[in-house]
Amino acid sequence: MLTFARQQQRKNIRWLFCLSALMLLTLVLSLCAGEQWILPADWFSPQGELFVWQIRLPRTLAVLLVGAALALSGAVMQALFENPLAEPGLLGVSNGAGVGLIAAVFLGQGQLPGWALGLCAIAGALIITLILLRFARRHLSTSRLLLAGVALGIICSAMMTWAIYFSTSFDLRQLMYWMMGGFGGVNWQQAWLMVALIPVLLWICCQSQAMNMLALGETSARQLGLPLWFWRNVLVVATGWMVGVSVALAGAIGFIGLVIPHILRLCGLTDHRMLLPGCALAGAIALLLADVVARVALVAAELPIGVVTATLGAPVFIWLLLKSRA
């Protein structure tokens, strides 16, 4: 038994090492990719200093952090709601952040500073997450909780559409494209949002013991002495913060939080000591690759990254849904 445990631990460490190496490679690829490819040898040329360090580097860092945040949010929500299909985009949390952001733009007449818009997006994500947690406490079945989340997402989406349709503000109409997901407008001025993600990401990755207990179910976690009320509320705040900041940076990006934790579990990373850092690395890799595709797929144009992740993630979600019903 001890030998098997050691073998599994070594296998998990190898997985994390491979994911770390792959993330570094995709980071380099992201800095090179664009309408004009710039190889590492040219990064310190006058042209490279402008395109790589001033334009592509802040975008790449934002993609990396948002991918890690969304994947971790999915893993946390799946343990928190005891629901393998829980995911920020699917359960309406991302749309809730969008409603908060659009409400801030609408009520503030476009005069609010960037930090206030970010806080409103975080507040919107927190409100939807708290509503979902309220539903979860009523011991709804997996399918009913999923439907409740989808319904909340539809309501939030309808609110955003109505606000944008009747608005004469260019800022609100511009948000319609932005809510499809994209990092085109990210620069060093949004560095404070990136910094705001880092401590929460690191803190979540260190909470493997509590996450393992939550994954066992409410009854087992309580018997093991876990203060459920405290951890539920803390994790709700952490998840809402990560999703809200991610939406403020890049708009609504779906399926990363659903697909990444499932793929890693299928690869054997079931212990949250390995699953959480693995989700952060794999989420960063997946979104970096999607961002590269979004940049280079069309000539002189850029695809919304939400379209790329939805196109790749929707078939995987259907497969997971059919598998969970089997």
UniProtKB/Swiss-Prot annotation:
Quaternary structure per UniProt? The complex is composed of two ATP-binding proteins (BtuD), two transmembrane proteins (BtuC) and a solute-binding protein (BtuF).
* SUPFAM superfamilies the UniProt entry points to: ABC transporter involved in vitamin B12 uptake, BtuC
- Any single GO BP term: cobalamin transport
Alphabetical list of PANTHER family matching this protein: FERRIC ENTEROBACTIN TRANSPORT SYSTEM PERMEASE PROTEIN, VITAMIN B12 IMPORT SYSTEM PERMEASE PROTEIN BTUC
Give the InterPro entries listed for this entry. Answer: ABC_BtuC-like (IPR037294), ABC_transptr_BtuC (IPR023691), ABC_transptr_permease_BtuC (IPR000522)
- Signal peptide residues are none
Residues crossing the lipid bilayer are 15-35, 61-81, 88-108, 112-132, 146-166, 184-204, 240-260, 274-294, 302-322
Subcellular compartments: Cell inner membrane
Protein family membership = Belongs to the binding-protein-dependent transport system permease family. FecCD subfamily.
Q: Which NCBIfam families match?
A: PRK03784.1
**What is this protein's record name?**
Vitamin B12 import system permease protein BtuC
**Coiled-coil stretches, from where to where?**
none
Q: Does the keyword DNA-binding apply?
A: no
